[in-house]
Amino acid sequence: MNSNTHAKSSNFHQSELDKFAALANRWWDADGPQKPLHALNPVRLEYVSARLEPAGARVLDVGCGGGLLSESMARLGAQVTAIDLAPELVKVARLHSLESGVQVDYRVQSVEDLAAEQAGSFDAVTCMEMLEHVPDPTAIIRACASLLKPGGKLFLSTLNRTPAAFALAVVGAEYIARLLPKGTHHYKDFIKPAELAAWLRNAGLQLEDVSGMLYEPWRNRARLSSRTEVNYLAYAVKP
């Protein structure tokens, strides 16, 4: 199935969808191509849970992939809707949900289309490791802001555009250690925190925090850090 079969939005690179769709069958393999993502997921969940009471919260996971974060939040009691434009990934996410018994409402849908249908519906929106893979990340942020209730919270993670990020996330992870498939990242699409802060302000959101996320490949572990040169998380609130 072509990855854009159900996609109305044009805010995606077909090559990016195809690249991640090809990893679908091993998405939940902790030792597979998404091994670093499995290491990052507990840290992402820790960051969100420290700022949001998950139990009973309506949460949207944008760019959910195979559902790692979606299921994790649902296990904590959140009512999770999760969207992705790759049908192959959503299929894997749904199958894993059936196996685990964790309920998540998975959809093949763009965040822009969902915003047109359900503005102001969610207590929190998460958008992790996605902004650097789309043509117009500002449109994603605007749609996320629209979907939040007043007082709602947006959680983001992405890669900083620094020499350190190029050395570690591209050269090191993809070509030397081979932790990720070659071509996973494009350095020119990485996002500086100051750029992200401006996009959030323009979307009417208040940036509350930026924290580094440090991945230690020799231990296959990740942790929060004050250093934002490579991976970082951000948290913003809708007034």
Swiss-Prot record:
Its EC number is 2.1.1.222, 2.1.1.64. Signal peptide: none annotated. One of its GO terms (biological process) is methylation. It comes from the Bacteria. It catalyses: a 3-demethylubiquinol + S-adenosyl-L-methionine = a ubiquinol + S-adenosyl-L-homocysteine + H(+); a 3-(all-trans-polyprenyl)benzene-1,2-diol + S-adenosyl-L-methionine = a 2-methoxy-6-(all-trans-polyprenyl)phenol + S-adenosyl-L-homocysteine + H(+). One of its GO terms (molecular function) is 3-demethylubiquinol 3-O-methyltransferase activity. Pfam families: Methyltransf_23. InterPro entries: SAM-dependent_MTases_sf, UbiG_MeTrfase. S-adenosyl-L-methionine binds at residues 44, 63, 84, 128. Keywords: Methyltransferase, S-adenosyl-L-methionine, Transferase, Ubiquinone biosynthesis. Gene3D superfamilies: Vaccinia Virus protein VP39 (3.40.50.150). Pathway: Cofactor biosynthesis; ubiquinone biosynthesis. The keyword Transferase applies. Belongs to the methyltransferase superfamily. UbiG/COQ3 family. HAMAP family: UbiG. O-methyltransferase that catalyzes the 2 O-methylation steps in the ubiquinone biosynthetic pathway. NCBIfam families: UbiG (TIGR01983). This is Ubiquinone biosynthesis O-methyltransferase. The lineage of its organism: Bacteria, Pseudomonadati, Pseudomonadota, Gammaproteobacteria, Lysobacterales. The gene is ubiG.
